[in-house]
Every structure is written in structure tokens, then in C-alpha cells.
Amino acid sequence: MAAGCLLALTLTLFQSGLIGPSSEEPFPSPVTIKSWVDKMQEDLVTLAKTASGVTQLADIYEKYQDLYTVEPNNARQLVEIAARDIEKLLSNRSKALVRLAMEAEKVQAAHQWREDFASNEVVYYNAKDDLDPERNESEPGSQRIKPVFIEDANFGRQISYQHAAVHIPTDIYEGSTIVLNELNWTSALDEVFKRNRDEDPTLLWQVFGSATGLARYYPASPWVDNSRTPNKIDLYDVRRRPWYIQGAASPKDMLILVDVSGSVSGLTLKLIRTSVSEMLETLSDDDFVNVASFNSNAQDVSCFQHLVQANVRNKKVLKDAVNNITAKGITDYKKGFSFAFEQLLNYNVSRANCNKIIMLFTDGGEERAQEIFAKYNKDKKVRVFTFSVGQHNYDRGPIQWMACENKGYYYEIPSIGAIRINTQEYLDVLGRPMVLAGDKAKQVQWTNVYLDALELGLVITGTLPVFNVTGQSENKTNLKNQLILGVMGVDVSLEDIKRLTPRFTLCPNGYYFAIDPNGYVLLHPNLQPKPIGVGIPTINLRKRRPNVQNPKSQEPVTLDFLDAELENEIKVEIRNKMIDGESGEKTFRTLVKSQDERYIDKGNRTYTWTPVNGTDYSLALVLPTYSFYYIKAKLEETITQARYSETLKPDNFEESGYTFIAPREYCNDLKPSDNNTEFLLNFNEFIDRKTPNNPSCNTDLINRILLDAGFTNELVQNYWSKQKNIKGVKARFVVTDGGITRVYPKEAGENWQENPETYEDSFYKRSLDNDNYVFTAPYFNKSGPGAYESGIMVSKAVELYIQGKLLKPAVVGIKIDVNSWIENFTKTSIRDPCAGPVCDCKRNSDVMDCVILDDGGFLLMANHDDYTNQIGRFFGEIDPSMMRHLVNISLYAFNKSYDYQSVCDPGAAPKQGAGHRSAYVPSIADILQIGWWATAAAWSILQQLLLSLTFPRLLEAVEMEEDDFTASLSKQSCITEQTQYFFKNDTKSFSGLLDCGNCSRIFHVEKLMNTNLVFIMVESKGTCPCDTRLLMQAEQTSDGPDPCDMVKQPRYRKGPDVCFDNNVLEDYTDCGGVSGLNPSLWSIFGLQFILLWLVSGSRHYLL
């Protein structure tokens, strides 16, 4: 009680200006500090207003109203027009799909199966021919085509419209009878591919993915462009692509049941772990899954206690858990299956509500657990697939019976080479009900967003299953076949969809976005995944994002709308309504993360949404209040156009300021370029030659940029150039909605680092959302010490009311010289006389820190030289205890957000090896010990060597040079977290004590009116040691939110409206047998003899 009274008395005395931390001189009173701050604010705002010409540019826009009209952005009309355009685009692609699927079924039904083919009878282009120049010209029975390729701008790579290409997975023998027959009958699709393109030249990839793994795509193109990614491995299998998985079967509820009894230890356990991981990769976000283990008891392997969505994060949790399972005890199939059925039949949790599956991985056993199946699965609505894993002598009968009696399939995985094949073939079984459903199952489905393997960037794919209709009668009542032949796919690039959602009348903070039934965005400004896979395309990213490659990027791109933006209850409601296919509109105040992800602003936004008919997608348009109207230039006189375009020529930079234009698609024949000088020259030459009214040009875009060029030139000529050099101003700039950036004088523009695309400028977008002058800290973490030397940016939006309509067509600003500001700052905050050390902000004071921070907590000014070198740095890294206290007293609030699209350095360098990731690679010491050959690891090596001799190309995919391996795994997908700080409320002043335990620091905080700045005067951190743990704002690697907690409250989603999981006509007698990869006994004996001879007689060779 006494201590509390003493603290209260101290605060009272401090606020009265009676005592200071040294007790020698009073700490300046709040009134005194406020007077300093008011003077600083007045000087800064006056400087910025006078030097920037914000009022003068507004006058220019008002003066020349005859050169433009103010047009409305009718949100409802705009979003519905865009939705109809997207519907039309996807409908046209669907028609191409239907033609392809019908032709494929017709051709295959007429195809006569052949066991033998004459030499070079099957003619095709193998897309991987260029990967291995030393490979044979052709396999027996086939002949290679060698297309002539041309560079195509639509595909961004070399293509041939004369041919289709074929991709065959590395672990499939190209000369097999099955492959040759498929090559033979699918060749007829080439003509349909070509006819589709003749009808719609905008078509992109058309692909048939076969259930055997063969992929035929048009137009032909080399699988990997060796000029970009030389000597990279190929692990592609069309059956594992997101679009194939979705099209091949209805969604799945899968329970993976793993035998962890003592008999599965060693190599068998390793094979099971890898098999489960590969099985998880066959699932998409429409599926639900869990993994349980059992011996004498059963339990979940992870924290998940029920089925969870098979998204990337949940699958990672399950994979990590499976890798940690251990084997012990005895097998009790009854316990395992009882646990599996109970969980699989729990309908009180979110699930796919379609195919119900149990996947059993075991080494075998004698028990059949008939009573469990009789209890839970009398109607056989749950399929049971069984996998006999490893080399053992158990009777396969019991676990094969389990599969056959429960409409599943039995597989054998004796070695590492059989895993990929046997963990994906279950999709053929799940496809049976679809085939038997006939036309009812012939529905085009559109996928989630994913990265195209052939360098189109982000795409969605329309899919349609292709059925084997051989032996089917005309009335389709005699169904003799239930095999799915494969999936037909047609790609739609997100860039094509973006073109249907024009943005350049919406202002930089207006945008479209679209979501799918999972709530994942397929359009959104923040959908920017990193291309980190071998053969994965380079796409346009923010400059801060690295562009690296890694083979792990086969995952679909799944960014939830609530992760793409800062979540609130209203956005949750909007997301739910969009998933349900409703239309609506909401206006509300929300937090907005800045383009550079350092700041958070508050702004009013109107969300307007509508469904895209014929699809499961929903489209929305977001507009700030100042974007309800836009300026449309009407430069009808060519003489005015010519006069304004003249100001864009580099020869006039000295007079008009260094000029940048946004790299937009102004004309069909004028390609945007990142080189501003080159693009500006091309633009001027094109306009001079063809005039802005050329039919190949977007007249509105060109006229708007010319209008802004004229207006901004007048600002330079009539105002900036006539002002004398103003002390402290290094540069002046203006940035416009039309795409103009002018920097004056010319020399300052030569060092301009901002994005020439004004719609991507972080400071520009922030200025529009703020009524104050916005001070922007330099990028300390990117540029390091000394970044402030280019000046501190101050910007403000030009605000107009034309006929009562609010417009913000431009932002003006200046760059302040830091040294001049320091001088002014010091003069303003010095008291005279001042005998003591704490009465003012003396330069390099030992006891007093005086700093100015912006609204994000970044340092902009200080009275210490060592702080000056840290301008632009987050204050939590400079004075962590004070920054924490500023949060505690509610000056700052913060928001922690996660980026699920990041790339990071791997935690540990992977070991090089020629085997698959679960294969054991022995050391030389292992091989030289004869005893080692009796272990299970030796048998694993024998299997791999035998496999490579029998099928020489099966393991070819894992042969890599060391530098290739290191480079390809240089980065990996990861989650990062970042914390943005912002002013919590409108309170202007804060005073108090920062308690550090054994000592305390008196402080006073005062915001600078009409700016985003705050002044802090506090006893130096050196006089009172406190919490030194850094408070970080910058992006850091993270585990993200706890998936175990997230699955307890899953976000709303909707699965497909139709489900094909059972059909009374299904013939399930074909339920599996012996694996085709089992080697002969004589091969094993012969290989073992050779290896033992090498070990005993050729030790010098091994060394």
C-alpha cells in the first residue's frame, strides 16, 4: 500500500514538472513537451505542404475539368459483369473438355488391344527426350517425333502446334504393352486438340491424364526447358497432380490404420512410414483423413482425434507423427478396426461425407476380424484397402480377404520401388461408381489454384473423367466395364481471369477477389506464392520475395480468404455467404495491411459479392469510399495529346522532372517492361507512330496517363521549378492513379527506388487511407545503416470534391534531409537556460533519449548519433523495454499475421543419396563388414539394385549431381509470422514510469497532430537496465498457429454437391493379388552371389 502511494506521488510530481530522474533538474512538464511537439509539427507540416504543392495540384485538377469526366464505379454492376465474363470463359473451356472426353471414350472403345507392335509402329513425341541426350532414339515398337519448336508468348516457352507431347513417369517402362496400346489409341486425340484450338485460339494446355500414368498434352513442348533448369530430376506423375486427383474420384473420408506391433520393426516399419506419407499425397483439400496406429490397443498417431481436412498443414502433422511411431507388442486387428470404424462413422465433425475408406498397412497376420466387419460394415459402405508391407512369410490370405469382402483392394509393397505405384492405384477402385453412374458423373469440376508444371504460373483446371465404355450397349443398361480410363483437363491461367476483372479504375486500394467452396482464394492481391519447385514457373512477385526453386512445390496453393486479409467477424460472415453462393454487400471499417507488410491502417471498405454461375466459385469487389468515382480523361484533340506526351520524353526530364510510367498493357503491340527507360522510349515511339486512339490500344488507359502527365508537368513548371531551393528538402514527387511518377529535380529521380507501378506503391496506398501527412521510414532491414541518407519520405493524398463527388487522383510529397531535420529537432527541444542534464533533448545526452517514431513503431529521428544510424529500424530492436511499455499503455496495438506462402532455408542440409527418401544408403564401412549383409538393410539394397537392373529407368529419377541436389533444395516452403504495430486510439498524450524492478525510467509521449508521428522523451536506457529481449517486427520463420487447436474449430466449407461412392452394379471381385514387382528367386540368388564376390574379392575397388 505504501509503495503504491509513493508511486502515485512520484507520478504526480513528475507531471507537475517538479522532479526528474536525477533529482537535479525537473523533468520537462507535459505542457513544455507539448509546446515543443506543436512547434515540430507546425514546421514539418508547413514544410511538406509548401514544398509538395498538394494544394496547387488540386487546383490544377479543378481548373481543367473540361478535360475529364467523373464516372461512377457501380460495384454491383461491375462485379456481376465480371462474374458473367468469367462464367463465359470457363463455359467455353468446358465445351472443349466435353469434346475431348467424348472422343477419348469413342476412340478407346473402338481400339483393338494388341500384344505386339511392329518396329517403330507407334509414333509419338516423348516430352522428356531432351532430358537425356544419350537415351535411345525409341523403345521397341515406337518411333520418336522431333517437333520444330517456336517461342510462344502465350505459354512463355517453346511449343509446337503441330504435335502433342507425351509424358511417361520415370518408373513406368515406355516399351510395355500397356503403354504402347495407350500411345496408339490416344494419338487420335491430337486432332481434337487441334480442332479445339481452331475454335478457341486462347486455349492453353489440353491434357489427358491416363490411369496408367501416361499424360498426353497439347501443344507439344519439352518437359523441362534445359536453358532454365538444366539436369533436374523428373518425379512428375500425372496421377498425383491436384486436378487428376479431384477428377478421378469423389471426395474421400479416409482412416489410415497402421500396424505397429513388434513384427513390423526395422525395414518394414520404414517402408510403412514412407507408404503412409505417399498415401497422404494422394489426398486433396476436398478430402478428410486421420492416421491411427494399433497393436494390442489402438490410438491416434497425432493430436488429431477425428478426421481432419487433408490440407498441407494437417498432412504435415500426420507425416511427422507417423515418422515417430515405434513398433512393439502384438497385433490385434479387432482393436484396430473397431477404432477405425468408430472414428470413420463419427458424423459430428466436419468431413467429406462421401467415399469412406480404411487403409490398412501391416506385415500380415492370421486374424480376419470378421465380427468387426459384420458389426460395422454389413452394407459394405466402407471400403477396406489392405497393404502387405515388407518381405515376410505370413499368409496373405487374411488381409486379402479383408479387402475383397469390403469392396476394396489388396496390394503388396515388398520394397521401396513399389510404394508410389501401389499407394495411388486405389483411385481406380474409387472410380468404379463414377463409371457406372455414366452421364450423371460427367460433370465438369474446377480445381483449387495450383502452380502449373508447364510454366503457366497459377492456374485452375477444368476436369472431366473419361470412362471405359467398351462392351456398353447403346441404351447403357449392359454395363460390362467399370474402369476409369483417366481424366481430361483444360487449364485456365489466373492471368486470363484477371483480365476480366479490370483494376485501373478502382484506385490502388480497390480490388477483386474470388474464392472456392473451401474458402481458398483464386484471385486476390495477396495471393503470391513463391515458385520453389524444379520446373515451376517464375511469376511476378513482390521484390522482397526470393525467387528460388525446390521440388517440394507440387502442393496446391491454398490461401484462405481469412488468411489473405486481416480477419474480423464481418469477413467471416462474408466468406460463409460467398461459399453458400449468395449475393450481398457490406460496408464496414477494417484493418488493412500495407503493401510492404510493415504497417496497418484503418479504412472503410465496401464488399460486394456474387456467385459465378456454372461453377462453385464466388467473386467479390472491394472498394474504399474514395473509389466510388474515378476520372475518365477525354483528350479528344490530338494536339493536346501530343503536347502532354511530349512531357514524357527523357529529353525533358531536366525541366519536367525524372518521369516513370506504370508498366501496364496500354496496347497489344506494346509489351510492358521492368526497364522504365526502355519502356518509356517504346511508349513514346508507339504513341507518336500510331496515336493513342489506335484500335489496338486501351484508349482510356492511354488518355488517363497523358492527362496525368500534363497535369503533373504543370505542377513542376508552374510551382516546383519557381520555388527557390528549400532547406531540408532533397526531392519532391507526385504519383498518380493514371500511372505517372515525377521526381524533381532530375538527379533525385535517378536514385528513385519506388515501384513505377503506382498501384503497387506501399506509401501511395497508405496515403490514400490517411488524411494526415504520412512519414515513411526507410527500409533498415533491407538497406541497413545509412538508408536514411536518401531522405525520409513525406506524402499526402490530393483530395478533390468534383460536383460533390470525392476523388483522390494523386499523392504528392517530399523527401526530407535527415541532417536538417535533426538540426531543427534539436533546436526545438532545447531549453535555455537549462543547467541540468534532463531538462531537454540535448544532442547525445547521456541521460535522456528523445526519439520520433512513426505509427508502425519505426525510428525516424533521435537526439543520439548512434540512433541516427538506425533510422528506419523497428524501435523494439533498439529499446525493447520501452516499446513493450508503449504497447502496455495502449499507445500501440499490434496484429500478428502469418504468411503461408513463404520460402525459407532448410533447417538442416539433407544427405545426398541415390535412393528414395526412405531408402537406406550404406556406408563403405557397412559394405566391407560381411556381417552387415545379414541385416534387413542389406536386403533393402538388394531389392533396389535388382529393381534398377530389371527396370533400369525406375530409379533414374533419383540420380543427381551434388550441386544440382544442393541447389534444388536450397529453399523450402514454410510459414513465417510478422507483427505489425499501429496506433490503438486517438489519445494524444501519455506519461508515466517504466518500472524495471530495481529502477525506473520517467517518460512522456506526445503525438504530432496531422501526421503519423509520435514524440517520446524518456530517461536513457543506459541509466536503468531493463528487459533487453528484442521485440521483433520483421518476418520470422514460424510453426504457425497450432494445427491441433485449429481443427477443433474448422472454418466453414462446402464439399461437392454430388457423390459417387457406391453402385449396386459394381463388380468388386477384382480385389488384388501379387505385386508385379516381385523379383524371381533365381535373380535374387544371382545378384547376391555377384555382390558377395565384389565384397570379398574387390575391396580395393570399393575403396
UniProtKB/Swiss-Prot annotation:
Superkingdom per UniProt: Eukaryota
Sites carrying sugar chains: 92, 136, 184, 324, 348, 613, 781, 888
Q: Which residues carry this modification: Phosphoserine?
A: 119
Q: Where is this motif: MIDAS-like motif?
A: 259-263
Q: Entry's CDD domains?
A: vWA_VGCC_like (cd01463)
Any one of the GO CC terms: presynaptic active zone membrane
Q: List the disulfide bonds.
A: 404-1059
**Principal location class:** membrane
Residue ranges that the UniProt entry lists as topological domain Extracellular: 25-1073
The record describes the protein's role as: The alpha-2/delta subunit of voltage-dependent calcium channels regulates calcium current density and activation/inactivation kinetics of the calcium channel. Plays an important role in excitation-contraction coupling.
Q: Which family does it belong to?
A: Belongs to the calcium channel subunit alpha-2/delta family.
Further details from the record: Binds gabapentin, an antiepileptic drug.
Protein name per Swiss-Prot or TrEMBL: Voltage-dependent calcium channel subunit alpha-2/delta-1
